[in-house]
């Protein structure tokens, strides 16, 4: 009864929506704007472009990254997403201070207030620590977003060439939820080549350094969109801690839908999500017709947890797998793609064995293993965001990224500046977002972006105190080891001299009091070395 009440109340909510995020601002989808290549909408607060009169931002030329990219995509100038968003727009709003948005009408993450000067930190909770009312509200919010047309954004239904270079706009309305399904599809879709074929080894959101910053930004935008659709500024994305899970704990009618009694691929009719229609789930069809997903409904949400290829994914990640992954010190290595060894990013993404860090294309682990395990809409990269479990899964992946950032304290220079796969260099604008943000801007700790995770916030104070000392220890451990070896040699020499001059005294019985002290010292050194 409580769940029904929440759903009805939320469904009848009077919406007052403001600037949003996504792909193409509705205000920039006309032929006039596309031909001018200037996407600098007016901020209603002062009726000036980008809120310039109020000092919120200015309309500026887009300056794409000129750093060389990797060899994975050996083409240039054939895909609309290259040097984003130059193909569509070469001028956009550049917001100042703590302002943000396609027209600088909002606050940056972590700030609020009329002038975006009030600092704010939100906590994302483990879904299994949420109250019944909170869970019901989450489901109601998702349903509302699924059935509410985004007032500020539209999706492209054709390439720039198919739009006749802007003179024939091809855009469509989309719901607030499906907007983010489409964004995930568009960033990961294959590229159309000039000879009529497609190039599959391209992805602006996966299989490269940008995987974690891109999804961090994506989740923040998704979270804020839900806040706007519902009018609930306190909403945060929950997460699913899947460490050591033996089954899909969220695949029940209480959460995101149990299994249909007569079909293993469908959801239980008792679940609200059984009526959901999915989009962008037919990449082979789009490629053969050389079309872009247009947001048309393509059938029910599919999920069949545990009925997957167990040779590829024998089990879900364990706590030991997670800890082994977090212990990797290098964010990115080698070719910076799915072949990277000892790369934290590649291991967390699931292309490398967590216990060794060695890439293995025959196995799907960590993040990838959940997509394979759920065995349905989640198992297709381009359409995986159709399943609402996607958001909770990626929120936990983001929390592991956060753990790594806090543990290793990397500088921005750790994120590769050049030679990463196309779209993944540090200064590359993330595809397909407007307003523009680079990969490097989200290679920062979550608290700098105004949010935290409940299980990290609870242990954060002790961790924050110890981290500087642990980092210093990591930096000097080799020096300490060398000093210990040198000290041992000196001690041996001195011992030899004493031995030659004091043979008789060496025969004296060692007192019982000294033995435990020496043993304790040896044990301490062994523990210290193993900890390092």
UniProtKB/Swiss-Prot annotation:
Residues holding Cu cation A: 184, 206, 215
EC number: 1.14.18.1
Localization per record: Melanosome membrane
Cofactor: Cu(2+)
Annotated positions binding Cu cation B: 367, 371, 394
Reaction(s) catalysed (UniProt annotation): 2 L-dopa + O2 = 2 L-dopaquinone + 2 H2O; L-tyrosine + O2 = L-dopaquinone + H2O
One term of GO molecular function: tyrosinase activity
Top enzyme category: oxidoreductase
Function as written in the Swiss-Prot or TrEMBL entry: This is a copper-containing oxidase that functions in the formation of pigments such as melanins and other polyphenolic compounds. Catalyzes the initial and rate limiting step in the cascade of reactions leading to melanin production from tyrosine. In addition to hydroxylating tyrosine to DOPA (3,4-dihydroxyphenylalanine), also catalyzes the oxidation of DOPA to DOPA-quinone.
Official protein name in the record: Tyrosinase
Native organism: Pelophylax nigromaculatus (Black-spotted frog)
Record gene name: TYR
